Amino acid sequence: MRPQQYGGECGMKKKHVILLILILLPVVFLHIMLATWGLSMSFYVKRLSSPPQNYFEITEEDFREIPELKKIFEDLRKLAPGESRSYELDIDTGNKVHSYLTEKQAGVGECSYTYCFKYGDAYYGAHMGTP
């Protein structure tokens, strides 16, 4: 009589699961990488009808720091109070703008938007999001 082997089937199942994971892991990783290549961020801005409690001012110095902002802010001048607009930014520019404006907002305190600022003679509320 042959002695029974315990766990033979269980050991084979574990090997199959591990093999399946090793095969699928690179496929999942590649799929995620391909899906994130075209990422972008949206910069949502609303012209406010009254000054927020805490805001910072956007100046020419800010445009020297983040040149991409100049075109956006020139376009914002066209908005009437209560109107809003969104701008699509590539992920690197979006992160750069977010970090810069977050730092400026932290210097003046929180507002009802992520960022509250004055540009020219108008006040704006803005936040970042994904399209």
Curated annotation (Swiss-Prot):
The chain crosses the membrane at residues 17-39. It is a single-pass membrane protein. One of its GO terms (cellular component) is membrane. Its main location: membrane. It comes from the Archaea. Keywords: Membrane, Transmembrane, Transmembrane helix. It is found in: Membrane. This is Uncharacterized protein AF_1573. It comes from Archaeoglobus fulgidus (strain ATCC 49558 / DSM 4304 / JCM 9628 / NBRC 100126 / VC-16).
